[in-house]
Amino acid sequence: MKILVIGGTGLTGRLVSKKLEKLGHQVIIGSPSHGVDIMTGEGLSQALENTEIVIDLSNSSSPEEENAINFFLTAGKNLVNAELAANIRHHLVLSIVGTDDALEIGYLRAKKHQEDNIKNSGIPYTIIRSTQFHEHTDTIIAVQGLADKVFVSKIDYQPIALEDVTDYIVQFTLEEPKNGTVEIAGPTRANMDDFVAKYIEISGKPLKVFSDEDSKYMHLVVPKSLLVPAGEYNAGKIHFEDWALSTLAN
């Protein structure tokens, strides 16, 4: 089966592409460096020739609201027009758990535009909403750290390993379109500061975690349960501590 992976040069895209190729599928990488630009439409029609499935793992160059909304609206329009012309039978998009619940956050509002674009397109689709990745922990520490202190929110957190994310993307790709939304999350739920503290403990870094109910996440005030599933979800297999031990040992 021929599958176009938009954002195929990114970390998630590379892993998804490798797994699909290992299963015997023909994967086309959709990125400007491979001659496919979803912002201009360049190379899209050629990439979609005899293609059955599109996986959209694209992201804006900046999380800033205006930039992100412009990206997802423009790219989404180009993708839908090209996919309708090519009779694509399944479009998948990777999104974020909680997108509906905090539209005052500009980036989530942009992701909602991306979701709605494919929902209203007439193309069979599956939206995969994921919690934050285990691999995001270093970014949290970098953004919220100051000298030897890391200020971390006590909001609910249920991160998932990138390995599990890509396994689910491949699984849903090879299933029939849901024409709806599925959610994926890690196997363990706790407060965000618990995960960060455990990671720092395993790493041996001389950092101290400070947290309270008012602490911000990535400089944003977010609802306590925004980043975790509110209903049914597909659980990952890799526990955070096991991932951290493996990652930090390398």
Regions picked out by a protein language model, each given a short descriptive name:
Residues 21-86, 97-103:
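NAD(P)H-binding glycine-rich loop region in Rossmannoid oxidoreductase-like domains
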Residues 90, 95, 116-136:
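Conserved beta-loop-beta element that borders a ligand/cofactor-binding pocket
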Residues 135-146, 172-182, 188, 205-206:
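Glycine/proline-rich active-site loop of Rossmann-fold NAD(P)-dependent oxidoreductases
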Residues 151-156, 182-189:
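Glycine-rich Rossmann NAD(P)(H)-binding loop
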Residues 189, 196-250:
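Mobile cap/lid helix-loop segments that border enzyme active or cofactor-binding sites
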